[in-house]
Amino acid sequence: NPYRDYYIWKNPVNGKEPNNWGGAFGGSAWEYDNETQMYYLHLFSKKQPDLNWENEKVRQEVYDMMKFWCDKGIDGFRMDVISMISKDQAFPDGEVKSGLYGDFGPYCVHGPRVHEFLQEMNREVLSKYDIMTVGETSGVTIEEAQKYAGEESGELNMVFQFEHVEDASPHAEFGKWTTDRYDFKAFKKTMIKWQEELQGKAWNSLFLGNHDQPRSVSRFGNDNPAYRETSAKMLATCLHMMQGTPYVYQGEELGMTNAYFHKLEDYKDIESIQYYTELTDAGMMEPDYMMKCLMLRSRDNCLLYTSPSP
């Protein structure tokens, strides 16, 4: 298959996965292919195999696709998990911090060639069009953000950082899966830091909600009917009075709140279902507590519940 090297394939190690990396949605980051008897890498869903950006043909295909849409007159690109396109080619095991699998972060996030690839993308495509670019860059620091979106970086216009939405429970054993209350002092400190330290160096993106987050009113405000509207106005004022480009997620303009589904079968989100199964089956979390976590933190709180088709 001429497109096989467009993806990342590895042989089994001792009859198992090439390393211990866990996927972002739960389970292993590797999927076994019976036909070829090899594993392919998918940091997210197994239906989303990672592209092999080390392959120059892959990069050129991406650039050609971007040019096609730019020529159609689009206004820009939001680049999903763009900070993860470069991998450590040794593919070492990751540290097992919680759960059953190792952390791929140190070997895939802000990888060794990511800035080289983005600078090439800028030369080949972005610099030739009047468009806006924003990159999703989980785990990005102030210093890294300046590399991605600095005035002289030659890469992107701005990035999404997630420090402010991850401030709720920095010591939570299982990451986002917690019922801990949000730490507003940490939120204030983080927002001030990003406002001050990017000033004159790079441009900020401003957001409280997106397709991966619960509803902002439920998380940062009070979704009790008596306080929902006031909370929504307070959050909108906070967001829009800062320097940067604000992003309003669908429903946020209405002050929409979490769904609070009480049964597992009501959830459709792959991340929620896989983590519920993984953590409860392993005895790491009680089912009742995990359901409370889903009600507060599941992505299904903000996703379209019905089919998006006409």
Map each language-model feature to its residues.
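Active-site and adjacent substrate-binding regions of carbohydrate-active enzymes
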Residues: 1-310
